[in-house]
Amino acid sequence: MTNNTQHTFRKKWGQNFLADTNLLRKIVRTINPTVDDAILEIGPGEGALTERVLPLVKYMAAIEIDPKLIKYLNGRDDLQDCHFIHKDVLMQKLNSLPIPTPIKIIGNIPYNITSPILFWLIEQRAHWT
């Protein structure tokens, strides 16, 4: 499968990208981002959620494992204020990432890594809200 950027979805990472604008609006409303928030987005994909949250917060970073998506995201002019990190989130410690605390964590997480990410978050509970 491909989408409008011609990015080939990578099965090994369980990639799926948000495209439904109504769903994205609901997610942003649920997140309720504020001007004081520092946000870490896990798996930004093509940046559909990123582009809606970024203008509403003080600081935003997004961690993405796919090098092709990192290149694409870094090339988007509308996302220049977001700090993109090319790493596997499960191999990171929140306090080592360049993000002010406390951190709010958001993401469209693939099913195949939901449990590992939840356990990763629990281990690092002191660093996020």
Question: Each predicted region: which residue ranges?
Answer:
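Catalytic cores of RNA-modifying enzymes
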Residues: 1-129
